[in-house]
């Protein structure tokens, strides 16, 4: 081999080896040296992404118990603490549900269909002695929770929606303290607003007291997985050493907001429309909004994005759970698709639903018949445009039969129908009306006067019906010719109109006499047979 190649390979391997040694030394001596930086639990510890600093082991809990004088607590508070620790051991938090893994496929489909209406706070499990009621999905009313040591917490049914938020990487919600009595009447009244993991002992613990949870308490304390100080320890007056007062105390009409940045796992708190502080970073577990009360009745209203936020930045950047108004800001599979904007022409051009409306015009019902037994399609008014005259549509056979049954007319060819109506004088219109009535009622009265033979052969009956049909056809022909003559000549005097009427009556009399003669001959033939 060429010695130059061997030398090049040796130099390359030595450089790579030196780089590996340098990187390993940097990770050992420099990694995580900053005290303010949060470290993460690796796969060897619970396999989750939770800040190690806020997790309490048994040694830390014993230290907290001794620090806050656990032995001098009331029996109820001691029992609540021991019961909470037992619940955590038997039902540990599911730290594997990270970055939206708590959502199943069915949950994702439900959020697509219902949007923000899919979120609601869970009702109290004890229906008979319920301590709170959830109204309108996001209004929580604690009404039977004013007894000593009574504790209850309501949790949202779904965790924070952190998936498929490409353009809005922050989830935010606000809670308004609608009603809360605090003072001499209720000195131990206490509530907490925050985030918890499931399962959580909501029947007897407030948010922030068990792993893993965080809460903003009404006394101003910030609780992160710490069972101490207890609520009663925080109500020992202004000189109490347990009131840290990290945050401003909460009262009625205050609005508390919690935000979560999906990309960095940062949790922050707002109060009355102003950002207060960032609580932690690097928390990627699925958290559920929760509201709890201790020995007090209160009413809370939670805003998940269905209304405008008090914190203006959340409105501008669309930090709500699911955006219904601006789907483009929160792109992805979750959320409701925006309805077509009918007022915007640029949007309507590319909308397939609106384009189909032009291709498929609606079918309106047929117009009603006028006094003369014709629809508006058969009438051609003088002065109408040529376009409207050309727009004539043929009726189907069923429609023709229905019209003929309604009018009581026999079938007449459409060529013989008069479709032109002009501004004729009243005398001509009266004549038209009389002729039309005679045309309708005449054949019926004649046929009814000449009854069909009750007893006879089939030939005699057929001859009778043939004669009746010929009589009606001749009658129709005569009346139509007379009507055409009247409309063409347009008589200007009443004398001409009376003459036309007399001629018509004479014609009808002659036709009747002819029919009677024919019928008599036919009856004589039948008798001879």
Swiss-Prot record:
Bilayer-spanning residue ranges: 3-23
Gene3D superfamilies registered for this protein in UniProt: 2.60.120.920
Stretches of the chain forming a coiled coil according to its record: none
Top-level lineage group: Eukaryota
Residue ranges, compositional bias (Basic and acidic residues): 477-487
Compositional bias annotation for Basic residues: 511-529
Start and end residues of each stretch annotated as Disordered: 383-427, 440-529
One Gene Ontology cellular component annotation held by this UniProt entry: vacuolar membrane
Residue ranges, Lumenal side: 24-529
Cellular compartment(s): Vacuole membrane; Endosome membrane
Topology, Cytoplasmic side: 1-2
Primary location recorded for the protein, binned into one broad class: membrane
Biased amino acid composition, Polar residues: 383-398, 457-476, 492-504
Pfam family, one: SPRY
Homology family: Belongs to the SSH4 family.
Biological role stated in the UniProt entry: Components of the endosome-vacuole trafficking pathway that regulates nutrient transport. May be involved in processes which determine whether plasma membrane proteins are degraded or routed to the plasma membrane.
Protein name: Protein SSH4
Species name: Debaryomyces hansenii (strain ATCC 36239 / CBS 767 / BCRC 21394 / JCM 1990 / NBRC 0083 / IGC 2968) (Yeast)
Upper lineage: Eukaryota, Fungi, Dikarya, Ascomycota, Saccharomycotina
